[in-house]
Design a protein with these regions (language model features):
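Long, contiguous internal "core" modules enriched in hydrophobic/ aromatic residues
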Residues: 2-180
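Central hydrophobic cores of alpha-helical transmembrane segments
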Residues: 186-194
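Substrate-binding/catalytic groove segments of enzymes
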Residues: 181-185
Length: 194
């Protein structure tokens, strides 16, 4: 947990540095704004790295807690699963948050750019669908490899099926269907489900 706290604290510092050019501009500090703007790319790279390490660190915590976790959810590949799931969860969150922001601030966007938001959402949906299918295939291979067939017909097994089918496979198909048929509403519902 100490490592995860460090990742989180450093990520918050990186996020503050990413946002600081706006504060410097608001305070009319032009030299500071230019300096902070030059730090942005390095800070974004640091932030992405820290968030990836944060997700793998959470997954590594599960490796140490094997006796306390049901065998359907425990795997030696849990850090990889955490990493892959964080990708599609992040894409889904961007779709959800972007939709809300677009509705609230659409009056501030020039009309010629309204359609570009839809294209961005379709691209994010395609990425989320691919990532969710990769995650599902990985989960299925681990399930088959670990020979956990006897655990499926239990109460915890039913919850596992709800998670894997209801919150991974169905949203993945919804993202793919929404991308293929250019349906923003289906993509938004899938983003909420994921």
């Amino acid at each position: 947990l100490f490592l995860i706290c460090w990742h989180f604290a450093l990520y918050m510092v990186a996020a503050f540095i990413e946002f600081s050019p706006v504060i410097a501009e608001w305070l009319n500090l032009e030299k500071a704004r230019r300096f902070l703007k030059n730090l942005t790319l390095a800070t974004v790279i640091l932030g992405v790295t820290l968030s990836l390490l944060h997700q793998s660190g959470l997954g590594a915590l599960f490796l140490m807690a094997k006796p306390k976790i049901h065998p359907l959810w425990w795997s030696q590949f849990t850090p990889v699963l955490f990493f892959v799931s964080s990708i599609y969860a992040g894409l889904s969150m961007i779709i959800f948050e972007g939709t809300l922001s677009h509705r609230v601030f659409s009056h501030m966007i020039p009309p010629k750019h309204h359609h570009s938001f839809d294209d961005i959402v379709f691209g994010l949906a395609k990425g989320a669908a691919i990532t969710m299918f990769v995650y599902y295939v990985f989960k299925a291979l681990l399930f088959i490899h670990d020979k956990q067939w006897g655990l499926i017909n239990t109460a915890w097994g039913y919850w596992y099926l709800v998670e894997v089918i209801g919150f991974v496979l169905i949203p993945a198909f919804m993202f793919a269907f929404g991308y293929r048929h250019r349906s923003l509403n289906i993509i938004r519902i899938a983003a909420i489900m994921a």
